[in-house]
Amino acid sequence: MNFRDKAIILKKRNIKENLAIVTVLTQSYGIYSGIIKDLHSKKNTIIYQIGNIVDFCWSARLDKHLGTINCELVKSYSYLIMSNKRNLFYTHSLIELTLMSFKERELHANLFEKWLGNLESINVGNINIKNYINFELLILKEAGYQLTLDRCGVTNCTQNLIYVSPKSGQAISAAVGEPYKHKLLLLPKFLVHNNCEPEDIYEIQAAFNLTAYFFNKYVLIKKKLPIARELLLKSILAYSF
């Protein structure tokens, strides 16, 4: 049993002096893990870094086996990811959310394409809060919990959407939500309108609170949100506005 695909390096865990288990997100087969040998060779040290895009080859005697992998580097992003703390927190938070939200060998083609886009955003120095939250919303959607933020879940109107129902994940208009606002989640304007960016730190905090609620309730269950996510938020709030 073997296959070849384009992949992104998500995780590397050393198991012996010269062996490691590497986990990747493939374009056509979902998350896959395998053993790499000769871990500390000059070539492999360069290839198996978090965020790198690789030509991925997996082989095993049976499909259910862990298997071994061999990769060739397509494009390296590892230096850019390590170049500053925000890039590092941004990438590691999304990696951990991806690994915690999906089982291995589930196909999520949309997720792979979004990952490529985010890596390229790091490459051109264009990572931002809106991209990050939209990625979290995509992870929720791919995990089966899509939020509907473009119209009111009660009236179907598209104006004055300022709340989200914690039960349905649907936007709620100001008029409908006013009597129940203490039970509702805040909906930042920049998640409703494509041409908007966060106006202040309160909108940023509200966006992180919104996705965190649905991750905790429906996806992660007893797992904790990544520490990198908390550090990312702190770094954003410390240097924004």
UniProtKB/Swiss-Prot annotation:
The gene is recO. GO terms for cellular component: bacterial nucleoid. PANTHER family: DNA REPAIR PROTEIN RECO. Keywords: DNA damage, DNA recombination, DNA repair. NCBIfam families: reco (TIGR00613). Disulfide bonds: none annotated. Involved in DNA repair and RecF pathway recombination. Belongs to the RecO family. This is DNA repair protein RecO. One of its GO terms (biological process) is DNA recombination. It holds the Pfam family RecO_C. The lineage of its organism: Bacteria, Pseudomonadati, Pseudomonadota, Alphaproteobacteria, Rickettsiales. InterPro entries: ARFGAP/RecO, DNA_rep/recomb_RecO_N, NA-bd_OB-fold, RecO, RecO_C. HAMAP family: RecO. It comes from Orientia tsutsugamushi (strain Boryong). Gene3D superfamilies: Nucleic acid-binding proteins, Recombination protein O, C-terminal domain.
